[in-house]
Amino acid sequence: MAIKSYKPYTPSRRYMTGLSSEDITAKPSVRSLLVKLPATGGRNNNGRITSRHKEAGAKKLYRIIDFKRRKFGIEGKVEAIEYDPNRNCRIALIAYKDGEKRYIIRPNGLNVGDVIASIDEGSLDIKPGNAMKLRFIPVGTIVHNVELKPGKGAQIARSAGGYAQLMGKEEKYVILRMPSGEMRQVLAECMASIGVVGNEDWANITIGKAGRNRYRGIRPQTRGSAMNPVDHPHGGGEGKKNSGRHPVTPWGKPTKGAKTRRKKASDKLIISRRKGK
């Protein structure tokens, strides 16, 4: 997907880039697949900030995405490629032969008019958009929209340009190389879709101006060293003085290199950590 630049009629637009919308179908969204989501602004039910640097952002409706892909044995035709304000990849509107319509994450190579399907037992053609259980997918295949628990819906490789690779099979598990580089066992009964999530150039765009992040619901981040001692462990001092300690969060926990991953029962399924760690 092409990256476009903008005419610099203001200084902030000079280095701003965006993504071309040539692939988007000029067609309204399906109203039955749109729902309202409450904008919390990072606050809980008491109105207190529980997640900093968040706000409502621009108004948007949530598109209901089919992450389970369990409509077995019925072919569907790609009716439209649409923009989704809630995620960084495009979505595809699938019209099934029984009349139902659903949105799915659009992989690279899936275009209007293509026919896709999901299958419970057996395998399908290895082409973008088809979905099947991991145990029927050949070793070496690139997949996305991968479940971690059968029937729960996809949790892995859903972001723009994301994918996992099937590296091997052992009894009731398959071995996946995750987007992070981690090698992990996943139950062979889990569903996965073929291909790489589209819109991979999203990682290369330049935001260019603060207002664009505000549209996305991202508020400015204040450095701890610019605060007072009452507000942050790095705060205080005369002038631009360093904090005199290892970097910590506002609550005093180590950061920038400190491990934050919790121990879970499923850790035993990890064969090797990400990037060879």
UniProtKB/Swiss-Prot annotation:
<dbReference type="InterPro" id="IPR022669">
    <property type="entry name" value="Ribosomal_uL2_C"/>
</dbReference>
<keyword id="KW-0689">Ribosomal protein</keyword>
<dbReference type="Pfam" id="PF00181">
    <property type="entry name" value="Ribosomal_L2"/>
</dbReference>
<dbReference type="InterPro" id="IPR008991">
    <property type="entry name" value="Translation_prot_SH3-like_sf"/>
</dbReference>
<dbReference type="GO" id="GO:0003735">
    <property type="term" value="F:structural constituent of ribosome"/>
</dbReference>
<dbReference type="GO" id="GO:0015934">
    <property type="term" value="C:large ribosomal subunit"/>
</dbReference>
<dbReference type="InterPro" id="IPR012340">
    <property type="entry name" value="NA-bd_OB-fold"/>
</dbReference>
<feature type="compositionally biased region" description="Basic and acidic residues">
    <location>
        <begin position="231"/>
        <end position="241"/>
    </location>
</feature>
<dbReference type="InterPro" id="IPR002171">
    <property type="entry name" value="Ribosomal_uL2"/>
</dbReference>
<keyword id="KW-0687">Ribonucleoprotein</keyword>
<dbReference type="Pfam" id="PF03947">
    <property type="entry name" value="Ribosomal_L2_C"/>
</dbReference>
<dbReference type="InterPro" id="IPR005880">
    <property type="entry name" value="Ribosomal_uL2_bac/org-type"/>
</dbReference>
<dbReference type="InterPro" id="IPR014722">
    <property type="entry name" value="Rib_uL2_dom2"/>
</dbReference>
<dbReference type="InterPro" id="IPR022671">
    <property type="entry name" value="Ribosomal_uL2_CS"/>
</dbReference>
<dbReference type="InterPro" id="IPR022666">
    <property type="entry name" value="Ribosomal_uL2_RNA-bd_dom"/>
</dbReference>
<dbReference type="GO" id="GO:0002181">
    <property type="term" value="P:cytoplasmic translation"/>
</dbReference>
<keyword id="KW-0694">RNA-binding</keyword>
<comment type="similarity">
    <text>Belongs to the universal ribosomal protein uL2 family.</text>
</comment>
<feature type="compositionally biased region" description="Basic residues">
    <location>
        <begin position="256"/>
        <end position="277"/>
    </location>
</feature>
<keyword id="KW-0699">rRNA-binding</keyword>
<protein>
    <recommendedName>
        <fullName>Large ribosomal subunit protein uL2</fullName>
    </recommendedName>
</protein>
<dbReference type="GO" id="GO:0019843">
    <property type="term" value="F:rRNA binding"/>
</dbReference>
<dbReference type="GO" id="GO:0016740">
    <property type="term" value="F:transferase activity"/>
</dbReference>
<comment type="function">
    <text>One of the primary rRNA binding proteins. Required for association of the 30S and 50S subunits to form the 70S ribosome, for tRNA binding and peptide bond formation. It has been suggested to have peptidyltransferase activity; this is somewhat controversial. Makes several contacts with the 16S rRNA in the 70S ribosome.</text>
</comment>
<feature type="region of interest" description="Disordered">
    <location>
        <begin position="219"/>
        <end position="277"/>
    </location>
</feature>
<dbReference type="InterPro" id="IPR014726">
    <property type="entry name" value="Ribosomal_uL2_dom3"/>
</dbReference>
<comment type="subunit">
    <text>Part of the 50S ribosomal subunit. Forms a bridge to the 30S subunit in the 70S ribosome.</text>
</comment>
